[in-house]
């Protein structure tokens, strides 16, 4: 048997009860994107019950969903990739990761400059595409590294591939990760952001690389691997969990490459969890407030669903979800604190089952463990009995 999780990165379905605290009142990535473009065409997801989860123009509710559907609420404080993915696999944070609305303090920047031998420019919260436009010429002239953060807990380093070769940029990220770990600050990710081209038309390349904090405790993926259930990671999953509980991984260039590589695993592996993150929704469209691009990417994914379902074996179970929101229609370019969809399909999965509002994303990881007959973890409630006879 195989379980397949596909995370539509940032495809939230409406504000969490505490969204106002995060400045995200009214956010609804799916609903607002659909409205902004005059409706979404997602017939395959609609048949799985997507339209039953929130009002999505063009995706009406169905009286008979082909699988189980519900919403998941995030128990951890935060609204970022790491927090969401860790919670899927059983880690519920007590305190959010550290943020740097005024940039990073001297006790981080000074040793970083010293160890890399390069000056830092920027050191402020910024949109990645905007800051390379703003500081790219200075970076090209001086070789200084563009360091920036966002409303997430991230230390990002942008560099032109002709000024700083990618392997060198990765080395600088490892230096930053070490300094941050030793500093006592809890920073979720260090991210390499290489770009190419000429000012002002720079393009970020797919050679991005994330250096995550290791998970704070044992995650469901590790339980699986210890019990002989392999875990195959597609996209940035391996980076998010810092390699913990991952048997094999592949990187992806874009969403469609991610779907192709997921299909490769579905065709070739006999047992295990195939765990995919499709990042374009978030990276290319959510943060750039581009609802048209976001809508097109959602429709492109939906068009591939029959292929995914058609490749599955009778005892496989597919889970489609998201890790947070990133509403492209709000003035903010940051993530939004939202509920996430939960769509479950398989030939043996009961049809038209409403799974309700799950109290934590950890219900997903707990259900995966239950499906493979692995001992439960501390957090989360399995919904295996609700979806299988």
Curated annotation (Swiss-Prot):
Stored InterPro entries: Alkaline_phosphatase_core_sf, DeoB, Metalloenzyme, Phosphopentomutase_DeoB_cap_sf
Enzyme Commission code(s) on record: 5.4.2.7
Gene Ontology terms describing biological process: 2-deoxyribose 1-phosphate catabolic process; 5-phosphoribose 1-diphosphate biosynthetic process; metabolic compound salvage; nucleotide metabolic process
Function description: Isomerase that catalyzes the conversion of deoxy-ribose 1-phosphate (dRib-1-P) and ribose 1-phosphate (Rib-1-P) to deoxy-ribose 5-phosphate (dRib-5-P) and ribose 5-phosphate (Rib-5-P), respectively.
Top-rank EC class of the record's enzyme: isomerase
Main location: cytoplasm
Designated name of the protein: Phosphopentomutase
Listed cofactors: Mn(2+)
Residues binding Mn(2+) 1: 9, 323-324
Keyword Metal-binding: yes
Residues reported in the UniProt entry to bind Mn(2+) 2: 282, 287, 335
Record keywords, A-Z: Cytoplasm, Isomerase, Manganese, Metal-binding
Protein family (similarity comment): Belongs to the phosphopentomutase family.
Annotated cofactor note: Binds 2 manganese ions.
Catalysed transformations (reactions): 2-deoxy-alpha-D-ribose 1-phosphate = 2-deoxy-D-ribose 5-phosphate; alpha-D-ribose 1-phosphate = D-ribose 5-phosphate
GO cellular component, one term: cytosol
Domain of life of the source: Bacteria
Name of encoding gene: deoB
Location relative to the cell: Cytoplasm
UniProt-recorded Gene Ontology molecular function terms: magnesium ion binding; manganese ion binding; phosphopentomutase activity
Pathway the protein acts in: Carbohydrate degradation; 2-deoxy-D-ribose 1-phosphate degradation; D-glyceraldehyde 3-phosphate and acetaldehyde from 2-deoxy-alpha-D-ribose 1-phosphate: step 1/2
């Amino acid at each position: 048997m195989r379980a397949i999780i596909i995370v539509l990165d940032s495809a939230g379905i409406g504000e969490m009860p505490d969204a106002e605290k995060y400045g995200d009142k009214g956010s609804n990535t799916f609903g607002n994107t659909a409205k902004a473009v005059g409706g979404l065409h997602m017939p395959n997801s609609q048949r799985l019950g997507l339209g039953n989860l929130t009002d999505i123009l063009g995706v009406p509710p169905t009286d008979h969903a082909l699988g189980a559907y519900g919403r998941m609420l995030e128990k951890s404080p935060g609204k970022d990739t790491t927090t969401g993915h860790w919670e899927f696999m059983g880690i519920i944070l007590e305190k959010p990761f550290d943020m740097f609305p005024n940039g990073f303090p001297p006790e981080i920047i000074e040793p970083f400059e010293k160890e890399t031998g390069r000056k830092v420019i920027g050191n402020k919260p910024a949109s990645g595409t905007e800051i390379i436009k703003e500081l790219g010429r200075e970076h090209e002239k001086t070789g200084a590294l563009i360091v920036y953060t966002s409303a997430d807990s991230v230390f990002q380093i942008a560099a032109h591939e002709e000024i700083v070769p990618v392997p060198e940029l990765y080395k600088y990220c490892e230096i930053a990760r070490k300094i941050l770990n030793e500093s006592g600050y809890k920073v979720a990710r260090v991210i390499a952001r290489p770009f190419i081209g000429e000012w002002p038309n720079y393009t970020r390349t797919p050679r991005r690389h994330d250096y995550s904090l290791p998970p704070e405790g044992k995650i469901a993926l590790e339980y699986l691997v210890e019990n002989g259930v392999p875990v195959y990671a597609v996209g940035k999953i391996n980076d998010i969990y810092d390699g913990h509980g991952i048997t094999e991984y592949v990187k992806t260039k874009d969403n469609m490459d991610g779907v192709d590589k997921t299909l490769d695993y579905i065709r070739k592996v006999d047992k295990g969890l195939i765990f995919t993150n499709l990042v374009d929704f978030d990276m290319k469209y959510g943060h750039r407030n581009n609802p048209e691009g976001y809508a097109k990417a959602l429709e492109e994914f939906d068009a591939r669903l029959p292929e995914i379902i058609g490749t599955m074996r009778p005892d496989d179970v597919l889970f489609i979800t998201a890790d947070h929101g990133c509403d492209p229609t709000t003035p903010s370019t940051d993530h939004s604190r939202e509920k996430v969809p939960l769509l479950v399909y398989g030939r043996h999965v009961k049809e038209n089952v409403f799974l309700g509002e799950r109290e934590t994303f950890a219900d997903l990881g707990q259900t995966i463990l239950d499906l493979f007959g692995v001992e439960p973890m501390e957090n989360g409630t399995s919904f295996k009995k609700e979806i299988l006879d």
